């Protein structure tokens, strides 16, 4: 999502408070809809999905939903199929969403796989590496020595 620039400061700013509030409202509503509804897409049968973030466009007419399929044994292809399935039923989800939230416009939904869970798992694995732990111990010893001086 493109960040908005502030003409006064010339710097990039993040999403507005309104976008953040609308995104959280939609995220909560989507979680409930996905939990309660029996979606007809074959890729979504007996699948649990977590919605980690919803980013809204400045006009609140488009929403990018970051999701992570849950379950042991899911392959990358399974995840891709689930994301494609969610995008196929996005019009249905938009209709249900329109009935459960109070907004002037119900946004178009686009689902994207949330890579942050994989990144966090990789970082955890990396920090457990003995060589990295050895380096972090050395760094903390140097910082402790500087604090004493």
Swiss-Prot record:
GO CC annotation: cytosol
Keyword tags: Cytoplasm, Ribosome biogenesis
Any one biological process term the GO annotation gives: maturation of SSU-rRNA
GO molecular function: ribosomal small subunit binding
Subcellular location: Cytoplasm
The organism's place on the tree of life at top rank: Bacteria
A Pfam family matched in the record: RBFA
Family affiliation: Belongs to the RbfA family.
Task of the protein: One of several proteins that assist in the late maturation steps of the functional core of the 30S ribosomal subunit. Associates with free 30S ribosomal subunits (but not with 30S subunits that are part of 70S ribosomes or polysomes). Required for efficient processing of 16S rRNA. May interact with the 5'-terminal helix region of 16S rRNA.
Subunit record text: Monomer. Binds 30S ribosomal subunits, but not 50S ribosomal subunits or 70S ribosomes.
Protein name: Ribosome-binding factor A
Protein species of origin: Caulobacter vibrioides (strain NA1000 / CB15N) (Caulobacter crescentus)
